[in-house]
Each structure stands twice: as C-alpha cells, then as structure tokens.
C-alpha cells in the first residue's frame, strides 16, 4: 500500500468512526513489529537510551513527513517530532485531521513502545501538541498522560531516571541483525529519494524550458524544498 493510499484510508476511518482522536487509540494498540526491521531492533535493544538513538537514526525508513529529535535536561528526557514535509490530502480540514492523526499516533505509539521497558514511563509522560484544545479529548483514555496544547513543537517528555532502564528481552545478536536490515532500508530510501529528486528537477527544467530555465531557488520552491 502506498503512502497516498494509506492516507486516504486514515481519512476515511476518521470520517466513518467520527473519532478525531483515533490516532491516540491507534498508537496505543500498534505493535513494534508493525514497523518492520526498526520494530525488531527496538524490541531487542539494550535500554531506553539505545531505543531513542535507534529511532532517531532510522525513523526516516518508516515515514518521511516528520523527523524525531531528543535531548536531556536536568530532570526530563524530551522527544520532539518536527515537520519536514507538509501533510496534504484533500482540503485544509482533511489535511489537518490527517496531520493530527499522524502526530498523535506517533507520539502515543512511542510512549506505548517505551512502556515495554517500564510501565511507569507512561505514568510520567507529558505530551505537547501545536494545536488548540478540543472537547473530544475528554472521551479518550489517556492513561494518566497530560496533554499541553498550543505548544511550539510536538513531542513528549518523561523522567530522566528512565534513560538507562534495561530491556528484559534484550538480545544483542538479534539487535545487530535487525540493524543490518535497517541500514539496508535506509540505503534504499536514499537511492530512491535521489532518483526521484533528479526526475523532479529534470521535469521542472523541461516543462519551463520554453520560458527560460528557472533558478535553483525557484525550483526548490516549486518542489517544496529548501
């Protein structure tokens, strides 16, 4: 299933269920293995710190609309999810609904996965989103997780004391094997992205050649790039 087909499926599910917070439930119920090699690497890694570094490095193999970043202060571990490409499907309302679904499913999915190391991690979590509050959040079981609205960045934080929390199912051999598959997936993605970018630039040059070649900044603007 292509990314576009999956996006249409999500929008239809949101419409049919009339549940704009479906992303939260989806994230809580998703299994790590649904993320392929990255999920298997996550399940076999040594501790929370390794899991966070792993996801930051190979997140792009699962979805390219966002990029994760994490850092630590004196008290908390912060995990942020920043926009890379705009989420668009249909009109502005559908696009916003899809974006909210993706962000919520990724944030709450990450919290759900980290709970495999310790169930207490979720209890200390606070989620940050960049949109306004909505009454329908009251109908969702947030598992004691607090949500902060109108924030500058989307993400979540949890107590620093869990950084070195061990994985009881850690398996170094399985982890290294999964990493090889992750590297292979990332290499394929880079090759495909380079090939697609070359095609897109070539198309822009050919399409507008009769009016003179566009500048590089103009091509970047048309391709939604910097």
Residue ranges of predicted features:
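N-terminal low-complexity or simple alpha-helical regulatory segments
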Residues: 1-84, 102
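Short hinge/gating elements
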Residues: 36-41, 92-97, 184
């Amino acid at each position: 299933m292509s990314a576009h087909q999956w996006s249409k499926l999500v929008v239809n599910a949101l419409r049919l269920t009339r549940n704009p917070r479906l992303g939260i439930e989806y994230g809580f119920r998703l299994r790590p293995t649904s993320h392929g090699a990255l999920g298997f690497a996550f399940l076999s890694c040594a501790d929370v710190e390794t899991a966070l570094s792993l996801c930051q490095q190979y997140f792009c193999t699962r979805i390219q609309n966002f990029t994760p970043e994490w850092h630590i202060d004196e008290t908390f571990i912060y995990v942020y999810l920043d926009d890379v490409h705009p989420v668009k499907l249909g009109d502005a309302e559908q696009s916003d609904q899809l974006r909210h679904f993706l962000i919520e499913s990724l944030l709450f999915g990450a919290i759900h996965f980290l709970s495999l190391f310790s169930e207490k991690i979720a209890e200390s979590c606070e989620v940050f989103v960049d949109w306004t509050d909505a009454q329908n959040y009251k109908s969702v079981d947030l598992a004691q997780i607090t949500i902060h609205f109108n924030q500058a960045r989307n993400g979540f934080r949890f107590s620093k004391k869990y950084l070195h929390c061990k994985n009881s199912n850690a398996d170094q051999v399985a982890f290294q094997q999964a990493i090889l598959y992750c590297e292979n997936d990332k290499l394929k993605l880079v090759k495909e992205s380079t090939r697609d970018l070359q095609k897109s630039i070539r198309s822009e040059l050919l399409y507008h050649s009769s009016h003179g070649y566009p500048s590089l900044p103009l091509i970047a603007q048309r391709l939604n790039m910097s």
